[in-house]
Amino acid sequence: MGRSEPLEITKTIRRHQLREMVPLADSTIYEMEQRGEFPRRFALSPRCIVWDLAEVQAWLIARRAKPVF
């Protein structure tokens, strides 16, 4: 297999920070993640789940650019 570029994550956010940025229900976010429509969460430890802040911000920018209808 070829070597891939290392992932660069500069900052992660926890669930409560995500809720402040994206006012959607947890179940909606989970379903969107499963469909590939929202950045995927990952575990830093078994009890610490985070999202990449840059990915969430990019998702918000893309959503803002889409027409509502």
Task: List where the protein language model places each region.
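Minor-groove-contacting beta-hairpin "wing" of winged helix-turn-helix DNA-binding domains
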Residues: C48-D52
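Short, solvent-exposed alpha-helical "recognition" segments
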Residues: R35-F42
